[in-house]
Amino acid sequence: MQETISKVRNSKPSSSNFFTFIQPILPIACVFFVICLVLILNRYFSFYASFDQGIFNQVFWNNIHGRFFQSSLSSSLSTNVVHANEIPTVYYHRLGQHFTPALLLWAPIYALFPNAATLAVLLVTLITAGGLMLYVLARQYLEPRLAVMITGSYYAANAVIGPTLCNFHDISQIPLFIFTLLLAMEKRWWWLFWLMAGLTVIVREDAGVSLFGVGVYMVLSKRFPRNGLAVCIFSFGYMLLLTNLIMPLFSDDISKRFMLERFGQYVDGEEATTLDVIWGILSNPVRLIVELVTPVGRTIRYLLGQLLPFAFIPAIAPASWSIAGFPLLKLLLGKGDSVLAINIRYAL
């Protein structure tokens, strides 16, 4: 068995034969890309795009014109408008709601094709590329047939198809970044690992939760304990610094609206910081347990939806729980109908 794994790991693709290396998964990836692209473009051109598509299109448009992350549509959702009944402003910076600097990576593409449909193409491309990176990652230890089965399960999962067929969202970058980060970890390419770690945390203000899970795995597996501890400190510290000091510079939305809408059951008052929410969760373990399992029916269906495409193998794999456990915990502890919806972006 060890000899087989060694042979697989030593069959490293070079730039010249990379296409040959990923060729077994290309038919499935191409089918996924084409079908999803046709469906999402039909959705957009049939005028079924939602408000979020307009927000991201406006943000991209303003970014390429030097008005970075300004959005009047986002302003209409701000606490100043929702709670204080103020008029939306055109110069409102969305970074107070969601801190998403990683979107600047794709601004040159949007500058070439400045249209909301470009974002639909970008969405499908990013999630498809995430699957290809998953295949390359799986091939580090598995033969092509098993790697194809795992990646095919990714492309067939409800938690992937649903978010791919909705409007553009920033979480679509996460699979590509995280799978690349894990590949870099396996290859000991630490420069790429830390680059992906940096890109991951700037996807969204809560993306550091996924990175924190990777750090926990690195520590508990005893493979890279020092790097893992550094990842945990970096991701957790970044989220605390960002949500408590940086985002409030742009607006009060994180404390007066978003934290309360998602985790208001753990705190009292009309505003709360991430530190307040964390303390509220840890200081009441009974409520923590209740929130984890209720509503029971929806929680079970959500877990089944996540595990079924992978034949429930992640459920018995400690590594899966250490990496995915913290993002899952964030969803289970939240409130609202969207947190346990398997077919929208949060499931990805």
What are these regions (language model features)?
Residues 55-91, 101:
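Extracytosolic helix-loop segments that constitute the early lumenal/periplasmic catalytic or substrate-binding loops
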